[in-house]
C-alpha cells in the first residue's frame, strides 16, 4: 500500500477523516449510466431473476411467516412522507431542503426488521431452492409452500449455513435458515448488540462471539465453513446473491412512488441516502435504482465518522486493500450495523461508476436525529439507520454536486428518500436508552 503520508497528500480529505470530522465527498469517478452499465459485472437480467425467485417463494413465506400474509408473502416496507422531520431539519441546520422528503421504512420490514431481510433472506432461499431442486423435492412450477414439511426440514437439517455479522444480517440469515430447518451458525463481532445475540439464540441459532471486529468474524466464519463440505457460507464481503436480493427493492419502490404520484425523470430528480457498512445493502439498492432511473437518480452512501471504510476505499481506489485502522481510525461506533473497517471490494468496484458520493456522520448526530424523528413523526429507528437522514441537508448545503450536475433549478421538483435501515426489532428498554442519549446530546448542543 502507498505510504499513508503519500495518500494524505494525494487525497487531502483523508486528513479530515483521520481527525474524525464529518466530510462530504463527491465521486469524481461517476459515469453516465449508459457507459457505467457496459462494464458492470451484473445486469438487469440478474435482478429480474432474483425477483422471480422471490415470487416463487411467496406462498412459502406467507405460510411460515403469518406477518407477511397481507402482502402475499412478499417482504416489503412502507414508504412515507416525513414533512415534520423535514421542517425540523431545516430549522436545526438552518438549511432549506428543496424537494419533498420521504422515509423508506426497511426498519419495519417483516421477519427481521431491517434492510438485511432483503438480501439475507433471498440468499438463504436461493440456496434452499438449489438443494431441493437437485434432490428432486421441488420443481420450479411447484407451489413452494410444500417446503413447509417435516420431510423438507429433515433434509435441510443435514446441511448448515454460516455467516459473519455485526447483527442485522445475522438476524435475517439466522431466522430464515432456522425456519427452513438448516443448522445455522452466526459469527458475531464485538460490536454486535446483546439483544440481537439473545434473539438469535432463542430461535435455535448457534451464535459464536468474537472480541474482534466484523472482518475477523467474517474471516473465522469463512474458515470454519471451508472445513465442512455441507456448510454454505454467506459471504457479506463478496456475495452477488445478497447484492441482487437488495437490488429487488428498486422495482418495489418504483410502484410505491407511482402510487404516491411522485414522478422521477430528468426534470424531477430522485436523491437516495443509504447507510453503508460493508456495502452490500446500499450497493444493491443503489444498483437496482440505477437500472430503473438511470441518470435521474442520485445515490449517496452514509457512514459513521469512526467507520468510513467505503469512502476511504472509493476515494483512494484501494477498495478492500485498505481498512480504516490502517490510517488510525478505530472503527468503534454505536452505529453497530455500520461498524465495518474494511469495505467489500466487489461492491466498491461495481458501484464506483454509479455512485454520486459519500458522506460521514458522527454518533452524536445519529442520536440527535433519532430523537428528532421520534418527536416529529413518531418513528423509531436504531442509530445506524439515521445515517441517511442528514443527507438532504448535506447535499443542499454543499451544493458542488448540484452545480456540477446542473440540478439547482430542478431541486424544487425533486424527491429525497432516506433509507431507514433498521429499528423495529429493538427492545423497548434499549430504544428508550437511545432516545435518552439523543435527548441529552440535544440539550448539550443547545
UniProtKB/Swiss-Prot annotation:
> Tell me, which GO biological process terms does this entry list?
D-serine catabolic process; isoleucine biosynthetic process
Q: Which UniProt keywords apply?
A: Lyase, Pyridoxal phosphate
| List of residues that carry N6-(pyridoxal phosphate)lysine | 116
State whether keyword Lyase applies: yes
List cofactor names only.
pyridoxal 5'-phosphate
Q: Is this entry keyworded NAD?
A: no
Q: What class of enzyme is it?
A: lyase
Which reaction is recorded as catalysed by this protein? D-serine = pyruvate + NH4(+)
What Pfam families does this protein map onto?
PALP
Q: Which residues form a coiled coil?
A: none
Q: Which E.C. number(s) belong to this protein? A: 4.3.1.18
* UniProt-recorded Gene Ontology molecular function terms: D-serine ammonia-lyase activity; hydro-lyase activity; pyridoxal phosphate binding
Instruction: Enumerate the InterPro entries for this protein.
Output: D_Ser_am_lyase (IPR011780), Ser/Thr_Dehydratase (IPR050147), Ser/Thr_deHydtase_PyrdxlP-BS (IPR000634), TrpB-like_PALP (IPR001926), TrpB-like_PALP_sf (IPR036052)
The record's HAMAP family line, in alphabetical order, gives: D_Ser_dehydrat (MF_01030)
Listed PANTHER family: D-SERINE DEHYDRATASE (PTHR48078:SF9), THREONINE DEHYDRATASE, MITOCHONDRIAL-RELATED (PTHR48078)
Q: Which family does it belong to?
A: Belongs to the serine/threonine dehydratase family. DsdA subfamily.
Q: What is this protein called?
A: Probable D-serine dehydratase
Q: Which organism is it from?
A: Bacillus anthracis
The gene coding this protein:
dsdA
Amino acid at each position: 500500500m502507498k505510504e499513508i503520508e503519500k495518500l494524505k497528500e494525494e487525497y487531502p480529505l483523508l486528513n479530515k477523516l483521520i481527525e474524525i470530522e464529518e466530510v462530504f465527498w463527491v465521486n469524481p469517478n461517476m459515469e453516465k449510466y449508459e457507459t457505467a452499465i457496459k462494464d458492470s459485472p451484473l445486469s438487469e437480467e440478474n435482478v429480474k431473476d432474483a425477483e422471480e425467485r422471490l415470487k416463487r417463494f411467496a406462498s412459502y413465506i406467507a405460510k411460515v411467516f403469518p406477518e407477511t400474509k397481507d402482502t402475499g408473502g412478499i417482504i416489503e416496507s412502507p414508504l412515507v412522507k416525513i414533512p415534520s422531520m423535514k421542517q425540523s431539519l431545516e430549522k436545526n441546520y438552518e438549511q432549506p431542503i428543496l424537494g419533498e422528503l420521504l422515509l423508506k421504512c426497511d426498519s419495519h420490514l417483516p421477519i427481521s426488521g431491517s434492510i438485511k431481510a432483503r438480501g439475507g433472506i433471498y440468499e438463504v432461499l436461493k440456496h434452499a431452492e438449489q438443494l431441493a431442486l437437485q434432490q428432486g423435492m421441488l420443481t420450479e412450477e411447484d407451489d413452494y409452500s410444500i417446503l413447509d414439511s417435516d420431510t423438507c426440514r429433515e433434509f435441510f437439517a443435514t446441511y448448515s449455513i454460516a455467516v459473519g455479522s455485526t447483527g442485522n444480517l445475522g438476524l435475517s440469515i439466522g431466522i430464515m435458515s432456522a425456519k427452513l430447518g438448516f443448522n445455522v451458525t452466526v459469527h458475531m463481532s464485538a460490536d454486535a448488540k446483546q439483544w440481537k445475540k439473545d434473539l438469535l439464540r432463542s430461535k435455535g441459532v448457534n451464535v459464536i462471539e468474537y472480541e474482534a471486529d466484523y472482518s475477523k468474524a467474517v474471516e473465522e466464519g469463512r474458515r470454519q465453513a471451508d472445513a465442512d463440505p455441507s456448510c454454505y457460507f454467506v459471504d457479506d464481503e463478496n456475495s452477488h446473491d445478497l447484492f441482487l436480493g437488495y437490488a429487488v427493492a428498486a422495482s418495489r419502490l418504483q410502484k410505491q412512488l407511482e402510487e404516491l404520484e411522485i414522478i422521477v425523470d430528468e426534470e424531477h430528480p430522485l436523491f437516495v441516502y443509504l447507510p453503508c457498512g460493508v456495502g452490500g445493502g446500499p450497493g444493491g439498492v443503489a444498483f437496482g435504482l440505477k437500472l430503473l432511473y438511470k441518470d435521474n437518480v442520485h445515490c449517496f452512501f452514509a457512514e459513521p465518522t469512526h467507520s468510513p471504510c467505503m469512502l476511504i476505499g472509493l476515494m483512494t481506489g484501494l477498495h478492500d486493500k485498505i481498512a480504516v485502522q490502517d490510517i488510525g481510525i478505530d472503527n468503534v461506533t454505536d452505529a453497530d450495523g455500520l461498524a465495518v473497517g474494511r469495505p467489500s471490494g466487489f461492491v466498491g468496484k461495481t458501484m464506483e461508476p454509479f455512485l454520486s458520493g459519500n458522506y460521514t456522520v458522527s454518533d452524536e448526530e445519529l442520536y440527535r436525529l433519532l430523537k428528532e424523528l421520534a418527536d416529529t413523526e413518531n418513528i423509531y429507528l436504531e442509530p445506524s439507520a439515521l445515517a441517511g437522514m442528514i443527507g438532504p441537508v448535506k447535499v443542499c448545503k454543499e451544493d458542488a454536486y448540484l452545480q456540477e450536475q446542473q440540478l439547482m433549478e430542478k431541486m424544487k421538483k425533486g424527491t429525497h428518500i432516506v433509507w431507514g435501515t433498521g429499528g423495529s426489532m429493538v427492545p423497548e428498554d434499549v430504544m428508550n436508552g437511545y432516545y435518552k442519549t439523543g435527548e441529552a446530546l440535544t440539550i448539550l448542543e443547545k
